[in-house]
């Protein structure tokens, strides 16, 4: 039978490098103390951390701005008294058709993970099923979700938009949202609610020409023309996703056609 296979365009649009310049005199000086090999090794490790952090930040930004829906209260860190948010995240993923095959993760900021680590039921071996969290600080899987943390997660600052309304009725599954009457900005990553429903949609694109998009599978309920649009407050985007939801393309920097001035090169 005829098939239509969706395709996506992957663009390498971010470039990073770390320079570690040394002269012979520099090496001679440090060899009187800690030694060049020790310092240079630390510099290599720090360079790798710097690049890894940049990659982590880029992936997280793409993840939350490309999400479908949100859960929770802006400005309130989850897991203060329980992990009740996790089954709600799982429900959203299940409703979206996400497979639960051991490859679904929740990546949270360090404040949320600190809250999670203080929950008594996760510290008690007889309730948690192990002592890894109490002794090593290792977060265990919960609700079929692998729990991870990242220091690169920061606050999303919402757009300034107010008083927007739908300029046309919306059907279940619509991802393109048309609005009018309002003013101000609506940014990618903003949390959007529509009057009459409790769903919290994530804007995947900024408002432009009266149009913005939300993540698939789109609207969960039919909406009427002139329904009010509300932009949620600033928030910290912890993200839940399947491994296949995010793709990362990395390559070594392109070599000039005539080569460069390097006398030695190593790819790790």
Put a short name on every predicted segment:
Residues 10-85, 94-112, 137-147:
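Long, contiguous amphipathic alpha-helices that act as assembly "spine/axial" helices in icosahedral shell
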Residues 1-13:
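N-terminal "assembly arms/tails" that initiate or stabilize quaternary assembly
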Residues 213-267:
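Glycine- and charge-enriched low-complexity intrinsically disordered segments
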Residues 85-88, 175:
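Short linear interaction motifs
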């Amino acid at each position: 039978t005829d098939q239509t296979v969706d395709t996506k365009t992957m663009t390498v649009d971010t470039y990073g490098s770390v320079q570690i310049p040394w002269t012979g005199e520099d090496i001679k000086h440090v060899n009187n103390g800690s030694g060049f090999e020790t310092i240079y090794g630390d510099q290599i490790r720090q360079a790798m951390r710097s690049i890894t952090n940049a990659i982590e930040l880029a992936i997280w930004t793409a993840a939350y701005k490309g999400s479908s829906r949100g859960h929770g209260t802006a400005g309130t860190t989850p897991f203060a008294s329980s992990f009740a948010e996790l089954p709600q995240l799982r429900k959203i993923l299940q409703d979206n058709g996400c497979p639960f095959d051991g490859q679904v993760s929740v990546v949270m900021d360090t404040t949320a993970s600190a809250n999670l680590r203080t929950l008594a039921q996760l510290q008690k071996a007889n309730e948690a099923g192990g002592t890894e969290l109490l002794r090593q600080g290792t977060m265990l899987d919960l609700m079929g979700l692998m729990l991870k943390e990242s220091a690169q997660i920061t606050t999303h600052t919402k757009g300034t938009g107010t008083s927007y309304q739908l300029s046309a009725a919306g059907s279940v599954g619509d991802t393109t949202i048309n609005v009018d009457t309002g003013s101000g900005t609506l940014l990618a990553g903003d949390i959007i609610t529509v009057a009459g429903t409790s769903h919290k949609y994530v804007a995947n694109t900024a408002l432009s020409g009266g149009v913005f998009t939300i993540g698939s599978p789109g609207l969960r309920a039919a909406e009427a023309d002139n329904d009010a649009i509300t932009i949620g407050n600033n928030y910290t985007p912890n993200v839940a996703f399947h491994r296949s939801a995010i793709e990362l393309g990395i390559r070594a920097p392109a070599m000039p056609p005539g080569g460069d001035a390097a006398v030695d090169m190593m790819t790790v």
